Amino acid sequence: MKKGLLILLCLPIIGFGQNVNIPDSNFKTYLVGEPLINTNGDTEIQISEANTFNGTIWCENMNITDLTGIEYFINLTSLYCPNNQIATLNTSQNISLTWLSCYDNQLTSLNLNGAIALEGLYAWNNQLANLDVSQNTSLISLVCNNNQLTSLNLSQISCALQINESDFSENPNLNCIEVTDLSCWQNHIGLIDTTYQYYSTNCNTTAIEEHTTNKKLLKVTDLLGRETKGTKNE
């Protein structure tokens, strides 16, 4: 009898533990209001609902400050969260994430280590001092201008990387981009802006072999990497 009573008392605790912790009320309101995410139509997001969702979360300009809970969306393919007040973002559990747009926030920390499928990162107009993309070997588009970057190491990126767009401009403290074992000339770079930076095989030495890059715009692409009509610069 006592054993059966103990099991019954534990059931509410077990049930509560199945809900995703989403402390930001604006983010939670968005998720609960999405029928493809909140499939049972209640007022919570269950872990099972988050785990099985394999679409896009689009929460632009919603006054969100915290994306805690995103880690349960392990099959999430795209995350668009620009124009918010997000300071930290951890996508290390989002192993299926291919596109991340987090520009126009207040990001000081961006963890991409587990997002091994990431192809496009758009993180301009933030406060990032460091950016580690060493595990994101599928990147084809990297735009992180207007941050506070002091270093950017692309050394672990495969030489087969098909980068077609990159912009590191307006990072006043970023002088060198380390590219050991990366040859930009073996890629298909269509747009690259390194107005205030140079490439080097060793950013820590005073005797630096500088590499220049042809900044001519070969094609104009949209945020999804698709070629669009535009004027090429000369």
Predicted regions and their residues:
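N-terminal capping/linker segments that flank leucine-rich repeat
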Residues: 4-78, 95, 116, 154-159, ...
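Conserved hydrophobic position(s) of the canonical leucine-rich repeat
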Residues: 53-54, 76, 86, 97, ...
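Conserved hydrophobic beta-strand positions in leucine-rich repeat
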Residues: 55-59, 79-81, 98-102, 119-123, ...
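Short, intrinsically disordered, charge-balanced linker/junction segments flanking boundaries
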Residues: 226, 231-234
